[in-house]
């Protein structure tokens, strides 16, 4: 219903409209919940709605045209009075729609729970509406990209991808050695009373025998692994372990009365 321009009514509608702009923030919060999969039903409905809007935008054009003509009727004149009247009626229609939406949310929204039955029912209704208008062409890959992006934002997949990326970024040399069985080399550095064995896939000086696993690495001659020591990964591509000096006692020989050498 289109009312004639009235200053008092225009002022009242302006106040009503100013107190009901929270709907835009509510929509923003709902979109955040849908994109981040906090509410799976909203996420599925968002993906289906975007798919339908892309494949068949004409399906929404009739609804948008009806709303536009109802709120903002076409005027043959461009005077200030007509514009103010349209603005007055638009604010009144918006305020009434907001009040009805708020009434539905307060009285009926609690029945739509994220349980299995209600979730399946709501998704099925949207899916049926989508399939009724869906005609996929081979050259339209944007919906597939939209769904891949939406699914990748799921908490489980998102945490898996972040964990995989972090492990790949922080432990690439370690994973490369363990998985590809790359030949690695052992080096010995002597510093003071302790000796450190470095285990790396990039030899920097004369290498010893190559091995394919840390389990096959033996301490240098006359050395043993330090007690309670283990291999430690040192970025970017080294493994280190402490060793201690433990020489084998030399074998001493003695001469018998007949001149032969007898081991002690």
From Swiss-Prot:
Chief place of localization: membrane
GO biological process, one term: peroxisome organization
Modified residue annotations for Phosphoserine: 260
Keyword Membrane among UniProt keywords: yes
Compartment(s) where it occurs, according to its Swiss-Prot or TrEMBL record: Membrane
Keyword terms of this UniProt record: Membrane, Phosphoprotein, Transmembrane, Transmembrane helix
Keyword Transmembrane helix belongs to the record: yes
Membrane topology value: Multi-pass membrane protein
Annotated transmembrane regions: 48-68, 112-132, 142-162
GO cellular component: endoplasmic reticulum; peroxisomal membrane
Name recorded for this polypeptide: Uncharacterized protein C737.05
Species for this entry: Schizosaccharomyces pombe (strain 972 / ATCC 24843)
Lineage per the UniProt record: Eukaryota, Fungi, Dikarya, Ascomycota, Taphrinomycotina
